[in-house]
Amino acid sequence: MANQGQRVQWGVDITKKRGLSNSRGRKNNTIPLSFFNPITLQQGSKFWNLCPRDFVPKGIGNKDQQIGYWNRQSRYRMVKGQRKELPERWFFYYLGTGPHADAKFKDRIDGVVWVAKDGAMNKPTTLGNRGANNESKALKFDGKVPGEFQLEVNQSRDNSRSPSQSRSQSRNRSQSRGRQQSNNKKDDSVEQAVLAALKKLGVDTEKQQQRSRSKSKERSNSKTRDTTPKNENKHTWKRTAGKGDVTKFYGARSSSANFGDSDLVANGNGAKHYPQLAECVPSVSSILFGSYWTAKEDGDQIEVTFTHKYHLPKDDPKTGQFLQQINAYARPSEVAKEQRQRKARSKSAERVEQEVVPDALTENYTDVFDDTQVEIIDEVTN
């Protein structure tokens, strides 16, 4: 192993081995948070056989600090009383940080795969760990990502509250319940005195409450506001697509109107991915001030044409969704296959969300991805 402070050189390929853990899990310790979203490994695959040795995420640290390790998180859920193993998740930490902050580069640790960019310094980084209130970053890499690696994305924080948080809240409630019960008796007597005083002054609180309930009921029975776009008497270029078939406004897909697959055209802005697609479209001011405009007479109308060029980031998932919609009408069988694959991935993701993690191993994190590990047994894995 290189000495402390030397630069990493991958001139000689080191055979990947699995070693012994220094402990029997991190059951009672707080697991530091990774800066990045995790990778979910395809079941049956071995991370250390697939992971490139320079597989360091982009976006944090300088060139000397592009060194660290991937740390395994084993997962399972209970199905009819039986334990069912779920695909492993792997979290990245920089050298000198995370659950193995004291480990040296290439130390043999079960559940750890070491990686580094060529030329990185073989010494602990000063990057630290992610704060509990900070969101994890999307994974981006210079090279190709193995097909068995699924790069996870952030979801709603509402689902990230752990059982430990609930237990803490439960304790607080039980401690305050006794005080509340004693205070309730005092509050009742004060309320009765106030009501009696108001009645003497001619204020009938009971009638006021009835009127308030009546108004509330009227509001709840009122019709739901109609959000359907009003397109009558509007030019085609001023119409807004609602939920439903858009061909009645914009016509069938053709060489001059080549955006949208069958699902998007049939559902309009009710299509599942419409919000993500809309984010890839330039704003009105961008089109107005950043386009090349021409105009010519066309009978009793003026034909206006504009050309607008802009760039979308290649590594943004929304860009891929957007590109799939271009000329989709011309390749229906290919689009249908892509849609079936998306549905299959969506169903797989829903099943993963049903996973159960034991209370004793769940940490209190603010992000949907926590780095909690189940106990890792000290065995050599071939």
Curated annotation (Swiss-Prot):
Residues 154-183 have a biased composition (Low complexity). Residues 201-235, 334-354 have a biased composition (Basic and acidic residues). Residues 31-153 form the CoV N NTD domain. It is found in: Virion; Host endoplasmic reticulum-Golgi intermediate compartment; Host Golgi apparatus. Transmembrane segments: none annotated. GO terms for cellular component: host cell endoplasmic reticulum-Golgi intermediate compartment; host cell Golgi apparatus; ribonucleoprotein complex; viral nucleocapsid. Residues 33-159 are annotated as: RNA-binding. The modification Phosphoserine is found at S156, S254, S256. ADP-ribosylated. The ADP-ribosylation is retained in the virion during infection. Phosphorylated on serine and threonine residues. Residues 152-240, 331-355 are annotated as: Disordered. One of its GO terms (molecular function) is RNA binding. It comes from the Viruses. The keyword Transcription regulation applies. Packages the positive strand viral genome RNA into a helical ribonucleocapsid (RNP) and plays a fundamental role during virion assembly through its interactions with the viral genome and membrane protein M. Plays an important role in enhancing the efficiency of subgenomic viral RNA transcription as well as viral replication. Belongs to the alphacoronavirus nucleocapsid protein family. HAMAP family: ALPHA_CORONA_NCAP. This is Nucleoprotein. The gene is N.
